[in-house]
Regions:
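ER/Golgi luminal nucleotide-sugar-dependent glycosyltransferases, focusing on the catalytic module
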Residues: 1-173
Length: 173
């Protein structure tokens, strides 16, 4: 974990500080989500972006077809960037809630707003790169520390069941 003494010097040098990208290698962000959760959540998100933020539509398509992305909903960034991101994000999420709700989903799957926000953070950030708002040289990636550990056997087994037998995730690992 990063300490205050380690972080403070980075704040002047970097506009955005993130956990290292998660790499899926054999799947795109969209296909991984489709196998492990419910793809209609991303499809409706795409519709909302096309309606409310059409200038982000191509970036959305580009991002969901990548095999890596910034996950975990963790970021440190300049206040003006964070304000812009949150305004954009919550406008989309509140509309997503209106359209989908959480009925008929178990408690684990009801957390899909957080999962969708992980993916669309990458859309927002990529668009900031494209528009020259954020310089990639002023982005810092830091290693991820799992304080609770990860059961890789259960995680791997659940992934294979999702990919080959359409068994959606039921919990975290």
């Amino acid at each position: 974990m990063i300490t205050k003494a380690e972080l403070e010097p980075m704040l002047d040098k970097y506009d955005v500080i993130l956990p290292r990208k998660r790499r899926y290698y054999i799947e795109t962000l969209y296909s991984h989500y489709k196998h492990t959760h419910y793809s209609n959540q991303l499809d409706v998100t795409s519709d909302i972006i096309k309606e409310k933020y059409p200038e982000y539509a191509d970036t959305y398509e580009k991002v969901i077809n990548k095999t890596s992305g910034y996950m975990f909903n963790m970021v440190i960034m300049r206040k003006d960037l964070l304000d812009a991101y949150c305004t954009w994000l919550f406008d989309i999420l509140f509309e997503l809630e209106k359209r989908l709700g959480t009925q008929n989903l178990d408690a684990f799957q009801q957390r899909f707003y957080g999962r969708v926000s992980e993916i669309i953070f990458n859309v927002w950030l990529e668009k900031q790169f494209e528009n020259g708002v954020v310089d990639k040289k002023r982005v810092k990636e830091l290693p991820i520390v799992y304080v609770e550990g990860v059961n890789w056997w259960k995680k791997g087994t659940a992934f294979l069941k999702a990919k080959f037998f359409n068994k959606k995730y039921e919990n975290s690992f």
